[in-house]
Every structure is written in C-alpha cells, then in structure tokens.
Amino acid sequence: METIIIIICFGLAWGSFLNVLIYRLPLRMSLFKPSSSCPHCNEKIKFYDNIPVLSFLLLRGKCRHCKGRITLRYPLVELLTAVSFLLLYSQHSLSFFFFASCLFACALIALGFIDFYHQILPDEITLPGLLLALIYSLFRTDLNLRQALIGAVAGAGFLLFIYGAYYLLRKKEGLGLGDVTMMLLVGAYLGWRQAFFTLILASFVGALVGIFFIFCKKKDFQYSLPFGTFLAPTAFAALLWGERIINAYLSLFKNLTP
C-alpha cells in the first residue's frame, strides 16, 4: 500500500511538471524560471497553492488573488499521469521497464496535450525521446536495437507515405511532419507491430470522433483535430495491451485454419 501511495504522489508530481512543459514549451519559455504565476493577474503562485490536484480542489478552480478560472487541464494532466504510472506498476512492478515506460508515458501525455492546444509536436520532446528509446533498446530483453530501428522506420515511414500521397492528391497537408517524428519515437519504443497497432487504432478512434462532430454540426462542417491527440493515448494503450490484442487477433485466424 505504501508503494502505491508513493507512486501516486510520484505521478502527481510529474504531472505538475508536465503542466509546466505543456504551457511553456510552445511559447519558448524557460521551464524553470520565472516561477509559476496566474495567467490572469500575473501574481506569483505560492507553493501551497501549487500542490497537484489538492490545491485546485481547495481553491475551487479559481486563483486565490483575482478569482480567475484555473483551466481543468492542470488537474487532468496530473491525474492522468498518476493513473498511467499506477497502470504501468500493476503490470511491471518496480522494474527498470516500469521507470522507462513512465518516461515514455510522460512524453505521450505532453505531446498529446501540446498538439491538442497548439497543433505542434515539438522536436524537443520527440527527438530526445527517440534517442533514449534507442539507447534503452540496448538493455532490453523484449526488443533489441535492430527491432527498435525497424519499428521507428516502419511507423514513421508508413505515416510519411500517407503524408506524401495525400499531398499529391489534394495539394495540401493532411498530416504534419510532427506526427511522423512522433511515430519515430513510438515505433522505437514499441516495435513495428505495436506501432502499426497504434496507427490503426488512432485512425479508427479519430474517424469515430470525426463522425460524431460531423453529425453534431452542419453538413459543411470542417472537422479538424490534430492526429497526435489520438496517437498519444493509443500508443499508451499499445504499451499496456497491444501485444495481447495482436496475439488474440492472430489466434482467430489460426483457429479458422482447417
């Protein structure tokens, strides 16, 4: 029980840092200074008003000084990070893979939210993440360096092909190159099978959300939501359950074989 509490606190603390990253990185601000302040009145936030989730609840989602509303994104990111860490712990306990996967999950959360709010996927996250994933593959038993490289090339290459084909047909970008670099990271950490699983699931979920928005709006409604917003949660789902789902799917064909 003590370990679970520590992991929850660890996840909430990392989530608080991710909130800083999500807000500041797209604005090219330093991640460490100046200290956090209210976006409405610029009053510096005291440490006791910056406790993950708890401060938001005690302040009822408002700044102590100007009563300006605090976005729900802050507690949401903190809770998502804590839950992600708990899910990873439930599968891998306190292993090296657990800590590495926590970093991968943090990268996905940051990329997903930044893409949702700013429609960019910063290289400052994807490229260092790719490098760490490749280095980590040297110490893994489930995925070696060769497989990590194949995963990166396969995932990003397929998306790059779609990018080029769409541009040739429509004369405009259907995907951003940031999605391609994000798939380099995803493929390097998960391998080619789970990279394709991520792409298929993200496309399916994105299509469902798109259909929902189209039905809720007028017929000429132009639906647009960054693909990285879907890649992030589906890549995490692939990390947790991807291999089991793929194996279960393939076993169906084996059972159908006469």
Stretch-by-stretch model annotation:
Residues L72-V77, D123:
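Select subsegments of transmembrane alpha-helices in polytopic membrane proteins
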Residues R193-Y223:
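Conserved post-catalytic alpha-helical subdomain immediately downstream of the catalytic base
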Residues I7, F98, L103-C106, A110-V205, ...:
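Functional transmembrane core segments of multi-pass inner-membrane proteins
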Residues L18, I22, S84, L88, ...:
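Alpha-helical membrane-inserting segments
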Residues L18-R73, F227:
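Membrane-proximal soluble regions of multi-pass membrane proteins
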Residues L177-G178, I211-F236:
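Interfacial loop-to-transmembrane junctions
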Residues N19-R24, R60-G68, L108-H118, I162-E173, ...:
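C-terminal ends of transmembrane helices
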